[in-house]
């Protein structure tokens, strides 16, 4: 879970960029790649790597209203 965020919002899968914090099935992930041709958003956390094919993705928002970016590992 991220420390500070200002709510969540659902945005189209194509608009998610690598590094965005994503909420999927109650767990927090980081978007790693967005393959628009295959219609897959690849996500990861410390223990899991998977992909999402949903059209709308829930992201955490920062104080500026934009998706929160992860720090590089």
UniProtKB/Swiss-Prot annotation:
The keyword GTP-binding does not apply. GO terms for biological process: cell division; negative regulation of cell division; response to antibiotic. Keywords: Cell cycle, Cell division. Causes inhibition of cell division. At high levels of expression, can also abolish the rod shape of the cells. Division inhibition by KilR can be relieved by overexpression of the cell division protein FtsZ. This protein is encoded on Rac prophage. This is Killing protein KilR. It comes from Escherichia coli (strain K12).
């Amino acid at each position: 879970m991220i420390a500070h965020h200002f709510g969540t919002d659902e945005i189209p899968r194509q608009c998610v960029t690598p590094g965005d914090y994503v909420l999927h099935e109650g767990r927090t992930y980081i978007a790693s790649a967005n393959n628009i041709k295959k219609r897959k958003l690849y996500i990861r956390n410390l223990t899991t790597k998977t992909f999402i094919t949903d059209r709308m993705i829930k992201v955490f928002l920062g104080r500026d209203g934009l998706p929160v970016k992860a720090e590089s590992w």
